[in-house]
Amino acid sequence: EAEHARLKELGNHAVLTRPAGDAPPSIPELFATQAARAPESVALVCGDLSVTYRELDEASNRLAHRLASAGAGPGRVVALLFSRSAEAVASILAVLKTGAAYLPIDPSSPDVRIEFMLGDAKPGAAVTTADLAER
């Protein structure tokens, strides 16, 4: 009850009044619809790299399956340590497909900040690139 009062105070009325079965489509659902509609269209450009919806869907599905087998899912957190990249986008989508929440970590953050974030969120898994793995 106190939480509902606080949400009302913050102005989040849509969440409080929307019927439970009337939720908007999720990001993975919207992405799947677009990937089915135009699989060979470019979904993302990062520098000289362009990735189609099909490629992004396949890459995020592979990672989502690995994360799910490691326990990622609703109520869980997955840490993502990436610079801005196509891999970061695929990883975010993969985490969302599992139903878990993602914790984005900027590699330029000081170690003490990263340690605090990890200690606070207690992620069940972490994803990064080989060059950032030592962080």
List each model region and its residues.
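Carrier-protein-dependent adenylate-forming modules in NRPS/ANL systems
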Residues: 1, 16-135
